[in-house]
Amino acid sequence: MAELTTIARPYAKAAFDVAVEHNAVDTWAEMLTFAALVSENETMQPLLTGSLASTKLAALFISVCGEQINEQGQNLIKVMAENGRLKVLPAVSELFAQYRNEWAKEVEADVVSAAELSSEQKQQISISLEKRLARKVKLNCSTDAALIAGVIIKAGDLVIDGSVRGKLSRLSEKLQS
């Protein structure tokens, strides 16, 4: 994955710079998300790794995307096809989203809890994270009964493990040392 990120970074940065310059960050985010979905399609995958000429591949990809991709987005697709990089579109989309969130002073936080969180609990977590990170926080909540109780929160580089499973694991490590 690190290699894909390295390959995708210049494309994501260039797309983001163009998006900011043209005040079209949300439009670009939607285009890249759609293009990433197309590139991940099981019918499209063999074409991306096959021996199809880059101009034909770009034309095919653009025709599949249709009106979802504007002229600037089509130019990005053409350049990526020419360099054999269409398979990294999901990584480009992901990096673009990170650049967008950083630019908008937003962060996505993954919250995994043992049981479904109430709206009040979600609001408390969101407020606490916004204070700690000095950013607007968007929560992605999920459940995992294996946590036993508590939550695990991941927001950027920050990881807070308040789960019983995590506490038991840390206790076990201390006892073994």
Swiss-Prot record:
It is a peripheral membrane protein. Signal peptide: none annotated. Its main location: membrane. Coiled coil: none annotated. Belongs to the ATPase delta chain family. F-type ATPases have 2 components, F(1) - the catalytic core - and F(0) - the membrane proton channel. F(1) has five subunits: alpha(3), beta(3), gamma(1), delta(1), epsilon(1). F(0) has three main subunits: a(1), b(2) and c(10-14). The alpha and beta chains form an alternating ring which encloses part of the gamma chain. F(1) is attached to F(0) by a central stalk formed by the gamma and epsilon chains, while a peripheral stalk is formed by the delta and b chains. F(1)F(0) ATP synthase produces ATP from ADP in the presence of a proton or sodium gradient. F-type ATPases consist of two structural domains, F(1) containing the extramembraneous catalytic core and F(0) containing the membrane proton channel, linked together by a central stalk and a peripheral stalk. During catalysis, ATP synthesis in the catalytic domain of F(1) is coupled via a rotary mechanism of the central stalk subunits to proton translocation. This is ATP synthase subunit delta.
